[in-house]
Design a protein with these regions (language model features):
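Flexible "cap/lid" loop of the alpha/beta hydrolase fold
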Residues: 1-9, 13-59
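Active-site phosphate/pyrophosphate- and oxyanion-stabilizing loops and adjacent acidic/basic residues
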Residues: 4, 125-126, 158
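Short glycine/proline- and acidic residue-enriched helix-loop micro-motifs
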Residues: 61-77, 81-83
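Active-site nucleophile elbow and catalytic-triad environment of alpha/beta-hydrolase enzymes
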Residues: 84-100
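Short alpha-helix in the alpha/beta-hydrolase fold that links the catalytic acid
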Residues: 97, 106, 120-129
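Short beta-strand/loop motif that positions the catalytic acidic residue
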Residues: 104, 110-112
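Acidic catalytic loop of the alpha/beta-hydrolase fold
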Residues: 115-119, 145-146
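Catalytic active-site module of serine/aspartate enzymes centered on a nucleophile-bearing elbow/loop
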Residues: 134-172
């Protein structure tokens, strides 16, 4: 969502964009169900407290492990800082209109897993149809975090690299 908002509001900011596991609409039923499964029932909205994070860790230990695997082992509690920073954005309703999406005139690579826990294939396809220069790739057997799905990491990076190489100006 952040990349989409920035490229819609500041069209000259980038020459290309990569959007993984996202759509232009916020808080669909599928999204909210995914959030509850991953973070636990009764998720707070807005700013998180330490008590909220303790409850999440108790209700969803797999979520803690997921974030710990993303960061350096010496920063095993960084997930708390990370979630405190992004949680308000992830839980505050915000969407882009179709008109705002259509303003994005740079090449956009949409990457998503066909088993994404937060965004359906149909939702990502809607976004694909609105973006004038979009490319869409669905990774079979992958969830939301494609780069952490066993066996899918090489494919994820190969797709990203190939897309970026095509966007670079030709060397003379």
């Amino acid at each position: 969502m952040v990349v989409l908002k920035l490229t819609s509001r500041y069209p000259d900011l980038a020459r290309a964009a990569i959007v993984g596991g996202a759509t232009h609409r916020f808080a669909t039923t599928h999204y909210m169900q995914g959030m509850e499964i991953f973070y636990g029932k009764g998720m707070p909205q807005g700013q998180l407290t330490d008590r909220d994070l303790d409850k999440m860790a108790s209700d969803a230990p797999g979520m803690v492990k997921f974030y710990q695997n993303m960061h350096h082992p010496e920063q095993k509690d960084y997930w708390r800082t990370f979630l405190k920073g992004v949680w308000p954005m992830w839980t505050t309703p915000t969407s882009l209109t179709e008109e705002e999406v259509k303003k994005i005139h740079i090449p956009v690579l949409l990457l998503d897993g066909d088993r994404d826990e937060f965004f359906t294939v149909e939702e990502v396809t809607q976004l694909y149809r609105l973006l004038p220069q979009a490319e869409m790739t669905l990774i079979p057997g992958s969830g939301h975090a494609i780069f952490q799905t066993p066996g899918k990491t090489p494919l994820f990076y190969a797709l990203v690299l190939e897309f970026l190489q095509r966007q670079l100006p030709k060397a003379s």
